[in-house]
Amino acid sequence: MDMISGSTAATSTPHNNQQAVMLSSPIIKEEARDPKQTRAMPQIGGSGERKPRPQLPEALKCPRCDSNNTKFCYYNNYSMSQPRYFCKACRRYWTHGGTLRNVPIGGGCRKNKHASRFVLGSHTSSSSSATYAPLSPSTNASSSNMSINKHMMMVPNMTMPTPTTMGLFPNVLPTLMPTGGGGGFDFTMDNQHRSLSFTPMSLPSQGPVPMLAAGGSEATPSFLEMLRGGIFHGSSSYNTSLTMSGGNNGMDKPFSLPSYGAMCTNGLSGSTTNDARQLVGPQQDNKAIMKSSNNNNGVSLLNLYWNKHNNNNNNNNNNNNNNNNKGQ
């Protein structure tokens, strides 16, 4: 029995001085039980009691706006001689018995400020997310289609001749394009059998093929040399002829093409000079034969003259006079 009582006494006695102080002080016990209450204690006055509100017969007037819609808020620095009031009309604070500060109207509410900032921040975030949101595949496809359509509108139509080209070449294009069955163009040399074929996109790929034949010399230049001007620069040994097969109503049209100066002065409108005449002959096997003479200083299909219109007229007049003198 004595040993049991001794053990219980040993367990009940504190092990050190700190535990004895904690058990003896009732304040520490209350703090251990309710820590929130102990944190709120410094907000009360130094004596541990809540200070009473000032008892006034009527509400104080606001020194700024003279409004009676005021209320007591708190004591400044826990001093009862400095009560702090708030005016609900102009939403400003002041201390009774103290000096007034230059405070703007409506600057005393913190809750509204925080709420407005939060609303503003959410609005800006939503707007930014809306602006930087990734595009859906449908919007990407529509935008790409719009860009492709814009580029296609800028590219000229290659299948149909534009009004400007038809205005520049009113008589050249109809003669080069077959009217009956259509078809491509094949420019072939007789001796070397070199051809340059191309098919216009606006014409079908069926029908007779026109021929460009050059004769009169054994050493025929190549087509590139012809383009550079080897055969079209007034050489009298070559006699070029364009044989073009028509479709249903072909006819012989021997004429000499106008000079470069005449084409420039007339704007390529199809008007010719005196020597560039167009004579319509009888039908011959449904073929339209266009021949160019050498009297015009080597006028040919690709009429690459670099002289002016007046110089060509003078040369033509001189040639006609020489022919008349020879005939006499």
UniProtKB/Swiss-Prot annotation:
One of its GO terms (molecular function) is DNA binding. It is found in: Nucleus. A zinc finger (Dof-type) spans 60-114. It comes from the Eukaryota. Seed endosperm. The keyword Transmembrane does not apply. InterPro entries: Dof, Znf_Dof. One of its GO terms (cellular component) is nucleus. Its main location: nucleus. Zn(2+) binds at C62, C65, C87, C90. Keywords: DNA-binding, Metal-binding, Nucleus, Transcription, Transcription regulation, Zinc, Zinc-finger. Residues 33-56, 124-144, 306-328 are annotated as: Disordered. Interacts with the bZIP transcription factor Opaque-2/O2. Transcription factor that binds specifically to a 5'-AA[AG]G-3' consensus core sequence. May enhance the DNA binding of the bZIP transcription factor Opaque-2 to O2 binding site elements. This is Dof zinc finger protein PBF. It comes from Zea mays (Maize).
